[in-house]
């Protein structure tokens, strides 16, 4: 019976591990118990988690580790077994994790020396071959203070009391929930570190990146997309599709190309699909650690596709924006003219402040004094009994623009610019509900306004009368011109008719219309519609028949035998 440190240890060789392991092993938890061992005469159970490293691949892995209870630090660079004491029981340690592990309550009553669990929680008892490589167990701690450098006995004793999770560093790509297991290993229990370095940094994953000054000035970021890890260089970052800032397998990719390589080509936002330290790159952008460029940036970084050395231009940083809804845009456009109209009323009201400051509660119930005066004088009769309605009064700039276009250019027009502001109306707003506000208006001012309106209407009446007279004169002149043209045309037609009647050929044809209509065509024997214009004797139905019969008819057509062959034949229709 031998008792060591009030606890017993079970050492398993490589053959026993190969008999119980699986070909895809992600985690190894070595449980030590005192129920089935021949050295079990101790009074306290001390559970230990062993970190097993390979002698072939991890020669520079764990250079030294310290034990909290034994106080001994090992410097073995080769493969070995390092015992890390844990003060918490194994049940609370396993149940507090987020990995796929089996709690001790689910184990059979007899002792299980080793439990092999992969990421899918699949248990295997078959014998598989592991080769010469063993996996590494990582103990993640929530430290109250950042872990320091190389391992010592005192640091180990203070940092091993907060172990609550068990992770795995399988191939450097990360565990199930966090890809940065190397950083987690630096904060492991006991402050264990390698030969050439020490683990530093924050231990809690809930702290922001802005709180860590090393992240703010970091040039290379270890990023991950799904299960693929790569390096992102801050100085080469452009936008999603421009700027080859991701180095993966000695090749440079843009963030979008890296997503496609990782199988996330259908992703819509590269800033959220690419992770760093368990967080998306969007969190780094929000905190100002990374600053992407705009999509239309023309700097050297964004134009490094083929000839990036010769490209130059300003750096346009990406500025997020929020689109306005269509309803808000419509409301803004509709409210614009309303504000302008209110401004116009306010300008008119400023000239009559003595009448507008009487009440503020009934501002909506207002009446226009000018409209009331116009209603009272709806019709005005001048000296020529001409009625004028309010609709005849138009704007002061060009009241008779439509009539000016129809007048003759020789007509004398009235210069409207010399009339001044005769059509400008003054507006007085009176509250209907308040009777005292109506009495405030001065009688002289009211009479002055009525006189002004009357003068304006009389002026418009005179202008309308003048324009009407000018239009009548222009109309009469045009009627005279048209009458003269009609008389000249009638006289010309009479002269032409008398000349046609005196012509014997035309008179003979007029008297012989009935005879021609009874004749037949000399060529086709159809009803004749015309006759030869040379001899006025041979009828034809068309020009075609006349041309066809001309060789035989030219002998008979002897009106002028000397010029028979030179005459131009014309067909005269009997209906003309």
From Swiss-Prot:
Keywords: DNA-binding, Metal-binding, Nucleus, Transcription, Transcription regulation, Zinc, Zinc-finger
Pfam families with a match to the protein in the record: SAND, zf-MYND
InterPro entries with a match to the protein in the record: SAND-like_dom_sf, SAND_dom, TF_DEAF-1, Znf_MYND
Biological process terms in GO annotation: embryo development ending in birth or egg hatching; positive regulation of DNA-templated transcription; regulation of immune response; regulation of transcription by RNA polymerase II
Record's compositionally biased regions (Low complexity): 345-362
Protein name per Swiss-Prot or TrEMBL: Deformed epidermal autoregulatory factor 1
Region described as Disordered: spans on this chain: 52-76, 189-215, 309-362
UniProt biased composition (Gly residues): 61-76, 191-207
Zinc fingers (MYND-type), renumbered ranges: 521-557
Main location: nucleus
